[in-house]
Amino acid sequence: MLKSISSSSGDDHLLSLIVSSTGKLHLRQIHALLLRTSLIRNSDVFHHFLSRLALSLIPRDINYSCRVFSQRLNPTLSHCNTMIRAFSLSQTPCEGFRLFRSLRRNSSLPANPLSSSFALKCCIKSGDLLGGLQIHGKIFSDGFLSDSLLMTTLMDLYSTCENSTDACKVFDEIPKRDTVSWNVLFSCYLRNKRTRDVLVLFDKMKNDVDGCVKPDGVTCLLALQACANLGALDFGKQVHDFIDENGLSGALNLSNTLVSMYSRCGSMDKAYQVFYGMRERNVVSWTALISGLAMNGFGKEAIEAFNEMLKFGISPEEQTLTGLLSACSHSGLVAEGMMFFDRMRSGEFKIKPNLHHYGCVVDLLGRARLLDKAYSLIKSMEMKPDSTIWRTLLGACRVHGDVELGERVISHLIELKAEEAGDYVLLLNTYSTVGKWEKVTELRSLMKEKRIHTKPGCSAIELQGTVHEFIVDDVSHPRKEEIYKMLAEINQQLKIAGYVAEITSELHNLESEEEKGYALRYHSEKLAIAFGILVTPPGTTIRVTKNLRTCVDCHNFAKFVSDVYDRIVIVRDRSRFHHFKGGSCSCNDFW
């Protein structure tokens, strides 16, 4: 074939051969032919060959592409753009930005919007905000602000560099916003933890009176992720309805995300409904279900789902096994969890245990009060344990009041230079649980010396699509007087039922137990639960999400509320879901 091309006068045949080439060896043969016949000098042929080599070859060989590009004496703008784009897809994106700057200095080759777009993608890949700012200035001076595609890429840069303010400014300047522009803004808000703004945007986009843009599958995917993060079940149902009404329900990735969203909002019945209504399921679908069952405390059901998946001939992925081991941990299924972990180590699933898997097993052993065994497992790991694994063990030390081991764990975290405010809070909890107030005072002084500030607790509850957030002693809510009055009434009713504040949850060494009980009275989840009882009809399920691990006192408070007020209370804290019903919790008082 190559020999026949050398004698052919038709470039079309050659271009077709370049486009259809399938591997590096084939492209090297074509390269040799182009050099031998001098066809490499043909700008069109060179562009096609460079594009195929730099952009289409899997795996890409950026070094070979650079050598070919450097042999071109007078590369055109298209040739340069191809290389800048290739660098944006490589592991050396900064080289693409350097080429762009070199191009800018060449007055005979003025950059076009494509050059700026590919250079921005190089900055996105490398996280180079300063370089992006320089390109933004050039876009302005070159008069490219009306290029919607280029401006959308600029938004993506600011979003990636966690500069949502400038991303929003760019969005406002885009003359004609399409769905892609909106989706980049959605992604920006999610990445920058402006999750509630995503819901506002979705409503605005969905109700656009001009009808210029409507949410597509990607928009719905991002909105569902926001609902999952916030625990906004009602809004998630609205997005689900939109998906069904607009013919998007057949998309596998949307169905998988719906299963995950409902699970993370504590609605496993809806998650099951979506899962078993799917026309096809892949390993991501099963993983979403298993992980959802795990975080909601349905360990046996998660094991059943895993075995069912294997019967369908679907092999698990790393995340699937993380969900499975987590399910065993959250449900106290020690024997089952160790059995699956041993099967992993034997190579049955062709997946070697990673840090996440070890973390789940440490959690499993810690929950079962097998702290020494958990510590031994960590010390025997083939890879170096990370801070998350040590924090998992530290959490178990807090629950079981093992001060000595807790102090050892903190020393490991300090050695990793990974200690955080939450670690010290766990150790403070451990000290307070066993009444070592002098240790609490010492540790607080150390935290002050190290300028370690604790993260404030924040609890959220959704009402008719609106998310209401509370912090401890919150007085910002417009209905604060009603909320505090309701909370006082709840406390009175719970006291009659036998509720007593768990004063070990109060980390300050106050003078009396009464003072400690008062200090615990206005924790954020209590305010959220009181608001839920205030504004919803009797029998309505109350769903609360919290950014931190819920304390023992608030956990007891929720148990009593579920019994006295005959409500199902679902609290999602940093570690898991707590389903409170009839005075009991699905976590069996271990979290």
UniProtKB/Swiss-Prot annotation:
Keywords: Repeat
Region (Type E motif): 389-464
Region (Type E(+) motif): 465-495
Chain positions covered by the region annotation Type DYW motif: 496-591
Gene3D superfamilies named among the record's database cross-references: Tetratricopeptide repeat domain
Residues in PPR repeats: 76-110, 112-146, 147-177, 178-208, 216-250, 251-281, 282-316, 317-351, 354-384
Molecular function (Gene Ontology), one example: RNA binding
Gene Ontology biological-process annotations: RNA modification
The keyword Repeat appears for this protein: yes
Entry's family note: Belongs to the PPR family. PCMP-H subfamily.
NCBIfam families tied to this protein: PPR
Name of the protein in question: Pentatricopeptide repeat-containing protein At3g47530
Species, as recorded: Arabidopsis thaliana (Mouse-ear cress)
Lineage of the species this protein comes from: Eukaryota, Viridiplantae, Streptophyta, Embryophyta, Tracheophyta
